[in-house]
């Protein structure tokens, strides 16, 4: 078994530098990369330095030299290998790899927002026909895809800021955005939690909803726990460590609804009051890395990290808009794109998603949210209503 002789930790001096680039072709999001972590990921996945070099498009000699350089800089061995055995990262390298991946995943929405700002500046400089639509939304993996779709097909730039459902709706009321994304389960029984949280933020008549997508939320667990978990209470029953979502997010409301539905208290769920994350992907990474045993999220996030997915609830993802802004050109373009066949086809190919019942259509809130209390109409004056009929009957000598 072989380790490379490395420098002492006191010799290590490293700095972090972020750069961005313009490239020809389609937009590819805001994925950050680094040669060291690309190297470690390839070795972890393939178990061979030679195969890792092939997958990264470089020579064995170059990759080996790069590995030795990084070991000298970090003051720690990074790879363990011996003749005839799989190469694997050291414990230090694995800790480093997971820590970097977690930090990158946590920062992804903010980096995506920065990329979006830069892309908007370039688009506006190149073509002034591009419409800009400010969006604040609960995190959703389909929205990032929608952003690319409307940019390519509708000359529309979605300036998306991901945050909790409640904060997004507050931003809409404060006119920080034209559209706010939030999600609610297709369950009448969810009214106690969701209506309490959303009633102060959504006003029938003032707010309108636009159908965007349907998605399934469920438990994400590592495969060694898959046989134990069939329902939400199983997490508490088996004492699995749970990673929560931040307060104010729609998924946190869903978790609280599920706890209420199954008569669970915060103390029954290990980790409920501890570790929290802000996106589905960050929750999935926490589970995959072993920081937690279970979390709630969408199926696409679970599959991205090789986790088992236990479906729990189907949700509607809505885009809210003030009634007075429905005629805005950017909102009209968005509705048209959502109603088009391209968006429906995208959702059909995204695990755990499907098209909304009426994508792109402007919905009346009391119809879209069946648990929302309907506004009772004022009782009509019966005598006033009868007066015209009586007059008409008298004129024609009819009895009513």
Predicted regions and their residues:
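N-terminal hydrophobic or amphipathic helices and topogenic motifs
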Residues: 1-176, 196, 200-207, 232, ...
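Short helices/loops that flank or line small-molecule/ion binding pockets
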Residues: 166-180, 184-185, 276-291
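A ligand-binding cleft/hinge motif common to bilobed small-molecule-binding domains
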Residues: 183-198, 284-313
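Short loop->beta-strand "edge-of-pocket" segments that line small-molecule binding or catalytic clefts
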Residues: 129-138, 233-257
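Short beta-strand-to-loop elements that line the ligand-binding cleft
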Residues: 157-164, 245, 265-280
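Flexible hinge/capping segments at coil-to-helix
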Residues: 212, 221-242
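Periplasmic-binding protein-like
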Residues: 33-36, 203-218, 307-336, 359-363
């Amino acid at each position: 078994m072989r380790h490379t002789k490395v420098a002492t930790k006191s010799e290590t001096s490293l700095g972090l530098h972020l750069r961005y680039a313009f490239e020809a072709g389609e937009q590819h999001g805001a994925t950050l990369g680094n040669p060291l972590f690309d190297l470690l990921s390839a070795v972890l996945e393939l178990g061979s330095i030679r195969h890792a070099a092939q997958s990264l498009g470089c020579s064995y000699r170059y990759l080996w030299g790069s590995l030795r350089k990084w070991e000298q800089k970090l003051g720690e061995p990074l790879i363990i290998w011996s003749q005839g055995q799989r190469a694997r990262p050291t414990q230090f390298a694995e800790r480093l790899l997971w820590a970097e991946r977690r930090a990158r995943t946590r920062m992804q929405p903010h980096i995506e927002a920065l990329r979006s700002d830069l892309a908007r500046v370039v688009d506006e400089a190149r073509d002034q026909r591009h419409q800009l639509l400010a969006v604040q939304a609960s995190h959703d993996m389909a929205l990032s895809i929608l952003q690319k779709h409307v940019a390519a097909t509708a000359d529309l730039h979605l300036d998306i800021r991901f945050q909790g459902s409640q904060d997004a709706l507050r931003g809409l009321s404060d006119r920080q955005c034209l559209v706010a994304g939030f999600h609610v389960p297709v369950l009448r029984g969810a009214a106690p939690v969701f209506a309490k949280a959303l009633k102060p933020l959504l006003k029938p008549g003032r707010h309108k909803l636009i159908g965007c997508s349907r998605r399934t939320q469920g438990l994400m667990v590592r495969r060694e726990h898959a046989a134990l978990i069939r329902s939400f209470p199983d997490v508490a029953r088996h004492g699995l460590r749970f990673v929560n979502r931040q307060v104010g997010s729609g998924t946190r409301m869903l978790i609280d609804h599920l706890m209420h539905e199954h008569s669970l208290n915060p103390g029954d769920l290990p980790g409920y009051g501890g570790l929290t994350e802000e996106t589905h992907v960050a929750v999935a990474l926490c589970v995959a890395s072993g920081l937690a045993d279970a979390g709630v999220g969408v199926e696409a996030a679970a599959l991205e990290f090789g986790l088992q997915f236990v479906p729990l609830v189907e949700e509607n993802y809505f885009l809210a808009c003030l009634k007075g802004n429905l005629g805005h050109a950017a909102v009209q373009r968005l509705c048209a794109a959502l109603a088009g066949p391209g968006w429906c086809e995208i959702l059909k190919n995204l695990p755990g998603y499907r098209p909304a019942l009426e994508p792109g259509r402007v919905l009346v809130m009391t119809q879209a949210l069946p648990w929302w209390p309907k506004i009772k109409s004022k009782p009509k004056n019966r005598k006033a209503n009868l007066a015209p009929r009586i007059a008409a009957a008298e004129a024609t000598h009819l009895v009513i």
